[in-house]
Amino acid sequence: MAEKRRGSPCSMLSLKAHAFSVEALIGAEKQQQLQKKRRKLGAEEAAGAVDDGGCSRGGGAGEKGSSEGDEGAALPPPAGATSGPARSGADLERGAAGGCEDGFQQGASPLASPGGSPKGSPARSLARPGTPLPSPQAPRVDLQGAELWKRFHEIGTEMIITKAGRRMFPAMRVKISGLDPHQQYYIAMDIVPVDNKRYRYVYHSSKWMVAGNADSPVPPRVYIHPDSPASGETWMRQVISFDKLKLTNNELDDQGHIILHSMHKYQPRVHVIRKDCGDDLSPIKPVPSGEGVKAFSFPETVFTTVTAYQNQQITRLKIDRNPFAKGFRDSGRNRMGLEALVESYAFWRPSLRTLTFEDIPGIPKQGNASSSTLLQGTGNGVPATHPHLLSGSSCSSPAFHLGPNTSQLCSLAPADYSACARSGLTLNRYSTSLAETYNRLTNQAGETFAPPRTPSYVGVSSSTSVNMSMGGTDGDTFSCPQTSLSMQISGMSPQLQYIMPSPSSNAFATNQTHQGSYNTFRLHSPCALYGYNFSTSPKLAASPEKIVSSQGSFLGSSPSGTMTDRQMLPPVEGVHLLSSGGQQSFFDSRTLGSLTLSSSQVSAHMV
């Protein structure tokens, strides 16, 4: 049916009549005009595409607008742009120019002409053949020390806050580019919450967990860099540091510190503010918003506020990397410890243990079964026995040994000495005054030594022992006519002689002159005497140096209050330590003074 109709003379006549109608004639003319306009705009767009892509987008928008305004077109225009009778070619050019201007504004180009008239197109085309003027760049901020921030962020950065304010570590340090060198800018920083949650640290999993909702908001604070305002050139040629910024949890703070809540997560922000837009900038007000304000933040700078570090890894990392935390580092890496310092001075410490009256009970009690007492009282209140002097473990070298001697010249009747397994190591007889002396030593402070009048030391050594004899006529203190004290020096095979033949030379002497006395140590090569140590209580003398004789004495002092000689005597054939003549006594009462004891610390060190 349709074919019949189409082939009918009526239908053919209607089509021919329509081709010569007024509407068809007007539409063809308009179509020709639009094609001319499109060719012209296409040429402009081709030239504008070299310099700015926004022009082509603007031209497309103008054509679209003109096609939308074309309502009376009889035939559909090809590829989308026909103009209606209500719009002229000038309007199309104006619309195209306006779209191109929008494109420049979007591209931040200063070359867009505000009028959008046809005369503006040649002006733009004249500017396009040359190099276009540089458009101002958008500000760019780069975080300095980003690697350190990332290390903290991987663990979970924590920042200490205190009432007085605490600086951040790592501190925010940035580098800014893209500013107008001649424009003035403010650089500021604020810290905003990441979310509205409160956190707690779970130690067994070493993670931060949500503990509830955030606390009430704190007063806003902004830290304005002290160098603000400054030109863009000044800001761009330096690293901008916010190391003086402090964090506090004191909501009543009036020092300008940033107020934060503990156990919350925060994000620092850096603001670049043009001076003309920073009139409302204040440390106690939020940062103003506007066209001249740019904010920058970095995800690795998120931190959790704490009053004490929760994660030990954060603590160690901050101690290692913070230059202000040197005091918390291991001192052994930087300086010698006290113990190492003391060890470098061997003479400060005794090389062997001190032999005291308290050590004597460690000597085993051997010998006759009838040996039950050491010292017998003399009726003056001294205890009859001192069993603690003879008991305990085996002998050690060096040590004092007690044993009987068949040639005793002075007995402590009826005391028996227990024999020691070692031969030649004997302490042959104290006089009965030894009990009094020992009792006097064990008494409280306030006791004084009663200096004997004529005791003397005579030491004669064998190949294995050094015998120090104490002789005299007075029995007050350490006095026996021919009592010998045998002490072994370990490994000392050569002879060691300490001779004081003069009867006037004494150990604890009054102000006596010693005439004709010959005092000497004789030490045969290759052995050497390291030193003796007679340990006394610090109360024995106000100054240990006073105990030492001014010339020729072999006694020294140590920091512990011990009278000791820690110097190695060279292995020479003869060493004169106590010279003849003068007042060279072993212990002189003029230097010793009134001696008081609180403990029985009279001992000897032998090496």
UniProtKB/Swiss-Prot annotation:
GO biological-process terms attached to the record: cell fate specification; cochlea morphogenesis; morphogenesis of embryonic epithelium; negative regulation of canonical Wnt signaling pathway; negative regulation of transcription by RNA polymerase II; neural plate anterior/posterior regionalization; positive regulation of DNA-templated transcription; regulation of SA node cell action potential
Motif (Nuclear localization signal): 36-40
A single GO cellular-component term on record: nucleus
Pfam families, per database record: T-box (PF00907)
InterPro entries reported for this sequence: p53-like_TF_DNA-bd_sf, T-box_DNA-bd, T-box_sf, TF_T-box, TF_T-box_CS
DNA-binding region ranges: 143-330
Keyword flag Nucleus: yes
Gene3D superfamilies: Transcription factor, T-box
Impact noted for substituting H524Y: In CAKUT2; results in decreased transcriptional repression through a dominant negative effect; does not affect nuclear localization; no effect on DNA binding; no effect on interaction with SIX1; no effect on interaction with TLE3
Listed result of changing K163E: In CAKUT2; results in decreased transcriptional repression through a dominant negative effect; does not affect nuclear localization; does not bind DNA; no effect on interaction with SIX1; no effect on interaction with TLE3
Ranges of Low complexity composition bias in the record: 44-53
Start and end residues of each stretch annotated as Disordered: 30-141
Motif extent (Engrailed homology 1 repressor): 18-28
Keywords: Developmental protein, Disease variant, DNA-binding, Nucleus, Repressor, Transcription, Transcription regulation
CDD domains given in the database record: T-box_TBX15_18_22-like
Function: Acts as a transcriptional repressor involved in developmental processes of a variety of tissues and organs, including the heart and coronary vessels, the ureter and the vertebral column. Required for embryonic development of the sino atrial node (SAN) head area.
Subunit: Homodimer. Can form a heterodimer with TBX15. Interacts with GATA4 and NKX2-5. Interacts with PAX3. Interacts (via engrailed homology 1 repressor motif) with TLE3; this interaction represses TBX18 transcriptional activity. Interacts with SIX1.
Name assigned to this protein: T-box transcription factor TBX18
Organism: Homo sapiens (Human)
